UniProtKB/Swiss-Prot annotation:
Family: Belongs to the CoaE family.
Chain positions recorded as ATP binding sites: A10, S11, G12, K13, S14, T15
Gene assigned in the entry: coaE
Catalytic activity: 3'-dephospho-CoA + ATP = ADP + CoA + H(+)
GO molecular function: ATP binding; dephospho-CoA kinase activity
Lineage: Bacteria, Bacillati, Bacillota, Bacilli, Lactobacillales
Protein name as catalogued: Dephospho-CoA kinase
């Protein structure tokens, strides 16, 4: 059984993943996969450098992720170019990791922030959506990424609204409350997985 984890930016997916890992389950983290592919010499690093030139690199040759993010979120054409380049490479890498893990794990998870936006729904037996109301999401993103309201709204707007993700979810984990309530919901869901009714 493969379970997809998704949610809006700053919804609390990382905390959910920590609880799942603590319970002994394997989680493939799409953001980490992307990070690895963007390392100097990686497939995405080379593809992005070819598309946007050396202006997206730091002095030491590493990818300047902050500069790249600013370029993408401020220009829809850049975002479209980047998505076209990256999505296929990422999909291939995630599929390879999924197939490898499926050989040894009966149940595992994949944390994919843009799961619905990029059409990964068919990969999963279940989808867990980490939900947070719009105001809380905005405040958390501004605090976490030190963004002003305008930039935070821009990032949230680049994803499918969380309400539109709900119909795809087999389980909605509500993170509008405190961290203890969030952890309790995840632990209950994991208990049901281990002991299905």
């Amino acid at each position: 059984m493969i379970i997809g984890i998704t949610g809006g930016i700053a919804s609390g997916k990382s905390t959910v993943v920590k609880v799942i890992r603590k319970a002994g389950y394997q989680v493939i983290d799409a953001d980490q996969v992307v990070h690895d592919l963007q390392e100097k010499g990686g497939r995405l690093y080379e593809a992005l450098r070819e598309a946007f030139g050396n202006q997206i690199l730091k002095a030491d040759g590493e990818l300047d992720r902050t500069k790249l993010s600013e370029m993408l979120f401020s220009n829809p054409d850049n975002m479209a170019t980047s998505s076209a380049i990256q999505n296929q490479i990422i999909k291939e890498e995630l599929a390879a990791k999924r197939d490898h893990l499926a050989q040894s794990q009966a149940i595992f998870f994949m944390d994919i922030p843009l799961l619905m936006e990029l059409g990964y729904q068919d990969w999963f037996d279940a989808i867990w959506l980490v939900y947070v109301d719009a105001q809380t999401q905005l405040q958390r993103l501004m605090a976490r990424n030190r963004l002003d309201k305008g930039k935070a709204r821009q990032r949230i707007a680049s994803q499918l609204p969380i309400e539109e993700k709900k119909p795809y979810a087999s389980l909605v984990i509500d993170n509008s409350g405190d961290i203890a309530a969030l952890i309790k919901q995840v632990q209950s869901a994991l208990l049901l997985l281990a002991n299905p009714r």
